[in-house]
């Protein structure tokens, strides 16, 4: 059908131009020349439909042999010969482009989220490390707090201690006073009994009594 319409429209123009150059205007001549250059066969509708509007279809509209009253526009003539263009291909491609763009954007956002969380974790861990005191500082503080009180208490204890009390302890036990022994008098028979009684009263032991008696016996023998 397209080929028949093309022959019915284009071929008469070609014959008219060849038969009588003055029967058609210059636009018809331009259309015929472009047709012969681009589509030598003359009946190839696909070849003519690929031609641009400015090179072929608009001059064809101005051709008085084809469109004497200019009732048809270039697009209408092109639709009659080439058919209506399919508009479904363009929206489909744009939809695919939009969906692919959205998918790339989603992937980029998904990739950026772990990076931001990792940086925040790194910052929080750095902050925690900076705020934690070092082991040396803790050891220094604990050593100072332990040694200082012990040193001060030791010095105070030494300063308040009476060295004489530690070195020379006093014996608090009362020492019994020993009454002096009465020296026996010579030529007195009661001297031995008196010495014995005096010795027992003064808390003297048996050895003291025996010693006094022996001494008295020696004195008596000497007399």
Curated annotation (Swiss-Prot):
Report if keyword Lipoprotein is assigned.
yes
Keywords tagged on the record: Cell wall, Glycoprotein, GPI-anchor, Lipoprotein, Membrane, Secreted, Signal, Virulence
Q: How does it sit in the membrane?
A: Lipid-anchor; GPI-anchor
Cell location? Secreted, Cell wall; Membrane
Please give the residues the UniProt entry marks as glycosylated.
Answer: 25, 188
According to its UniProt entry, what is the function of this protein? Answer: Probable GPI-anchored cell wall protein that may be involved in cell wall organization, hyphal growth, as well as in virulence.
Q: What is this protein called?
A: Probable cell wall protein PGA61
Q: Which organism is it from?
A: Candida albicans (strain SC5314 / ATCC MYA-2876)
